[in-house]
Amino acid sequence: GAGAAGNSTIGVSAGGYSLQSSIGYFVFSSSGGQSDFGDLQQKQWLPFGVSNNIRGVFGGAYYATDYSAPFNANGFSDFIQFATKGDASNFGVRVPTYASASINSSTRGIYAGGVQRYPGTSGGGSPSYDNQDAVTYMRKIEMATLGEEEHFGELSFSGGYAMGVSSSTRGCIGGRGGNKHGSSQVNTIEFVTIATQGNPTDFGDLTDARGAGASCSSSVRGVFMGGNNPSGSTNIIDFITIATTGNATDFGDLLSVEKWFQGCSDVHGGLGD
């Protein structure tokens, strides 16, 4: 349930299940647990994370104030500077969804799909967690610019808990969760060219219809891990070659079944090729 981001040296997780404000980090080249980085502006669950080598941005979370109806949270977005440990600062964008997939280049971050958090924004919304509306829209932010976002395009399916992988030029969105909100799992993978706004194009299929899994990528390959399929949580790992279209291929298995978790890498699209 945490958001994940990373540069070429450290990986960072922010927020988490049952609502947490903590930000932790680990060094990719070393084994071991996390160390304290700082705190988010408020407790969050299921934020997206995008990053380049300088900055990580988190947004689109389920907030502590969301547990009481009607929803009144402000849709905060946070950012950190990887080189400077400390609390997150306000990025200045109001994000109306949670459980969105995310992709990015070194200059642009995109969040896609998700579940509407509160009324009064495009797609509606409901003060009941079980009945909130899944959405199709994709929104972009510029990593170096605070307080600005813009419509990017529309997925072919609505829903939260999809998984995103990207090179520096192309982003792929795979799967969809079937946890509440009237949506079943899908195996669809779609892609966009990150520099060009527009609707995504069909890429292929995952090996299994699922969502709420983790994902990570290099400049060449995207990997989807675990998640929730119609039978329950799974340990499946599959991968795609980002530059070419086609169905995902089996990679192996996680040590245990997992869902509602995130992945990051030290060679993703936000760091260039």
Regions flagged by a language model, labelled:
Residues 1-273:
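Polar, enzyme-active/binding microenvironments
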